[in-house]
């Protein structure tokens, strides 16, 4: 089970679980949409994963901990004062039912991390469908390296970003990429999904390698140029 729960204006709280197992929750934006979903489906929670410190990713953690005080909350050092109880940077988290790879993906924030388990990539604000995150407390070189790190994952990896930015990202991608065919095809599909109020994600890493300019950028300089252009797009 892999479920993006809409929160705030365009955030997704991700819930993932193997059959008959407690679930993992990624980036608790707010408690309100998450709690009813967990209760209606009678899901226990095995772990919470935080990608970075921004309020739209951790704003519901304190409330969650009031309902689930014994659930471990994993996150980078920058989340220590945001509710993280177990600090991670890279390596592996092993719980009763899951093995979760932790990948350092700084750039959007300096200590941002991403998580991979069972072929699902929870990449927060590092990688979006057809885009990548803005650079705030990290730097462009760091963000480029992070995206390159994610690019090495298998093509069938499910990309699970934290925002519904896909249509805007596709518009930018079409403006800068030489081969626009895959971008145009994906835009048609995403427009239909969004018209039906369905999420555009997850996608696959293989697809992202065709439609995401930040995975296609040939060098750090081109990456930085495109990222700065996207900021003004």
Swiss-Prot record:
Subunit structure: Monomer.
Pfam families named among the record's database cross-references: HAGH_C, Lactamase_B
Gene (UniProt): gloB
The keyword Secreted is assigned to this record: no
Protein name stated in the entry: Hydroxyacylglutathione hydrolase
Catalytic activity: an S-(2-hydroxyacyl)glutathione + H2O = a 2-hydroxy carboxylate + glutathione + H(+)
Residues holding Zn(2+) 2: 56-57, 125, 163
Organism, as annotated: Actinobacillus succinogenes (strain ATCC 55618 / DSM 22257 / CCUG 43843 / 130Z)
GO MF term set: hydroxyacylglutathione hydrolase activity; metal ion binding
InterPro entries to which the protein is assigned, alphabetical: Clx_II_MBL (IPR035680), Glyoxalase_II_hydrolase (IPR050110), HAGH_C (IPR032282), Hydroxyacylglutathione_Hdrlase (IPR017782), Metallo-B-lactamas (IPR001279), RibonucZ/Hydroxyglut_hydro (IPR036866)
Cofactor(s) annotated in UniProt: Zn(2+)
Described purpose of this protein according to its UniProt entry: Thiolesterase that catalyzes the hydrolysis of S-D-lactoyl-glutathione to form glutathione and D-lactic acid.
Record-linked PANTHER family: HYDROXYACYLGLUTATHIONE HYDROLASE (PTHR43705), HYDROXYACYLGLUTATHIONE HYDROLASE GLOB (PTHR43705:SF1)
Binding site for Zn(2+) 1: 52, 54, 108, 125
Cofactor notes: Binds 2 Zn(2+) ions per subunit.
GO biological process: methylglyoxal catabolic process to D-lactate via S-lactoyl-glutathione
